[in-house]
Amino acid sequence: AAYFSKLDNSAGLVNGRDPQISRADIVNIAKKLIKKTDETLLIQGQIVIDGIPNVGKSTLLNQLTERKVARTGNEPAVTKGQQRVKLLEGWYLIDTPGMLWPKLADQESAYRLAVTGTIRNTAIEVADIAWFLAELLMLEYPERLASRYDYVASDRGAEHFFDELAKLRGSIGRGGKADLNKTAEILLNDFRSGKLGKFSLEKPPT
């Protein structure tokens, strides 16, 4: 939130720790941003919620309106079309389907999106997605693996981690080796359900 607040024509309202924002917070910051660009936009009083799929746009809309006006789900493409909802007098909030870049040249960005569920598991092999997450956890957040799985990260790599996780969770395949797809699903489900705790897959530039 602090990083985005420093960018031009941008504001960071939510950091994942502090209390949830209100409708008045949204409108007030919108007014401030509009005054920096084009004050004629104040007449329209429309705020669009847009972003990548499965990031919580509809959840935010439901929270702000204090009722379930948008369908939510733990998968991309739940929202199919635009929806206009009254926020405050003279102000409307528009929910939109998630949007992705036509092509992601940066493969690490693609994997980070896939880990969160923004890109469907059918687009990238689930084992590859989980492998990326395991390597990131071992490098950046080894304490998460220790806390959840009692696993001490080392230089033995992701394959050793999946073997140990398979033994722990009973996802052993033929030959006594880890069933990689089943074990990958376990890791991804734990991450997506918040069982690994709160942490970022990407850090702001320094």
Give each language-model segment a name:
Residues 1-51, 69, 170-171:
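Canonical P-loop GTPase G-domain recognition
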Residues 3, 66, 109-113:
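Glycine-rich, phosphate-binding/catalytic loops in enzymes
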Residues 25, 29, 59, 132, ...:
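Alpha-helical scaffold segments in soluble metabolic enzymes
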Residues 37-41, 62, 68-74, 140-145:
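Short, structured loop/turn "capping" segments at alpha-beta junctions
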